[in-house]
Amino acid sequence: MKTQQFTVIDPLGIHARPASQLVAKATPFASAIEVRTEEKAANLKSILGVMGLALKQGSQFTLYVEGEDEDQAFEALATLLTEMGLAQ
């Protein structure tokens, strides 16, 4: 299992457009991919789940990836989060 904590830095938070890009990036991977806050957890392959987290600027979350392609999935998602300026 690979995990990393992130803090949302985008002033708009993770709203519909970046959430859909994260879901699109996560969906092809076989690994289980989850985002957890202190209060909630969501499957990163579910747009409704990600939107339900209501991640605003300053929110902290942890990315969990577990499965046969976890290394590739984790790298792709962590890179997308940072390159889009969503989280660090």
From Swiss-Prot:
It comes from the Bacteria. The keyword Cytoplasm applies. The modification Phosphoserine is found at residue 46. Keywords: Cytoplasm, Phosphoprotein, Phosphotransferase system, Sugar transport, Transcription, Transcription regulation, Transport. One of its GO terms (cellular component) is cytoplasm. It is found in: Cytoplasm. Gene3D superfamilies: HPr-like. General (non sugar-specific) component of the phosphoenolpyruvate-dependent sugar phosphotransferase system (sugar PTS). This major carbohydrate active-transport system catalyzes the phosphorylation of incoming sugar substrates concomitantly with their translocation across the cell membrane. The phosphoryl group from phosphoenolpyruvate (PEP) is transferred to the phosphoryl carrier protein HPr by enzyme I. Phospho-HPr then transfers it to the PTS EIIA domain. This is Phosphocarrier protein HPr.
